[in-house]
Design a protein with these regions (language model features):
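Short amphipathic alpha-helix initiation/capping segments at coil-to-helix junctions
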Residues: 70, 123-130, 154-162, 177, ...
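C-terminal hydrophobic structural anchor segments
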Residues: 141-196
Length: 228
């Protein structure tokens, strides 16, 4: 007897993703973002892919001359939007990532599924937000130091550093960043020297408490410049 799974347009996203994962056993296994590219097509996905082609500073930060063939840069962008759009305060007034349960893959899947069919105006807003935030990041860190552990000689890109830098910079004015770029740079160096933070960017990085620790402590550094 042959078992047949029928995927309908209105099938639950977790069912679709599970079936794709079960089928994903070929010679070249698809990564998570390649699966999302199949499952969550729409204006949000298009916006992220267009940004990977158009934003030269972003490509320079990643040391890429062209978009990544397997959409790792697209995932970087989606991750930023998912984090930034869910920054909130808990009942104690601490900054946290609302709705995050410690499962990053599921969190990004849910975000893409919920926003895949955004309007053309929303798509343009996504692109403007990203471009403006990357511009601010480059003002402070340039393309060589952005999202790196600048407290050491390590030149690796840390998505875990981008997770708190990007949402915070989005909420700071360009004028504030231009006037305080040396202070911000130094503050990040000192922040990354904290043992607790150093552990958080490389160990159990998607754990809910660890994610919220990074956000809470970094946003607290800029309470005078960020309003939530």
């Amino acid at each position: 007897m042959l078992r047949v799974n029928v995927i309908k347009k209105d099938s639950h996203r977790d069912i679709k993703y599970d079936i794709f994962m079960r089928l994903n056993r070929g010679a070249v296994t698809l990564n998570y973002q390649e699966l999302r590219n199949c499952l969550y097509r729409g204006n949000l996905n298009d916006a992220a892919k267009e940004l990977c082609k158009e934003n030269e500073d972003f490509l320079a930060i990643l040391k890429q001359k062209q978009p990544h063939q397997r959409y790792l840069d697209v995932e970087f962008i989606i991750r930023y939007f998912a984090f930034s759009d869910n920054i909130s305060r808990n009942e104690n007034g601490d900054v946290c990532l609302a709705g995050y349960r410690g499962k990053l893959v599921q969190f990004l899947n849910e975000y893409m599924d919920g926003h895949k069919n955004c309007s053309p105006e929303e798509k343009q807003s996504y692109k403007e937000r990203f471009n403006e935030t990357i511009e601010k990041v480059v003002i402070v860190f340039g393309t060589d130091k952005a999202f790196r552990d600048i407290s050491s000689d390590n030149n690796k890109i840390y998505k875990t550093i981008a997770d708190f830098i990007m949402p915070s910079f989005e909420r700071m004015t360009k004028e504030y960043i231009e006037s305080n770029k040396e202070m911000i740079y130094t503050r990040l160096v000192n922040f990354l020297r904290i043992d607790e933070i150093q552990d958080s960017i490389s160990k159990r990085t998607s754990d809910r408490d660890i994610v919220n620790l990074r956000l809470r402590m970094w946003f607290k550094e800029f309470e005078d410049a960020i309003t939530l």
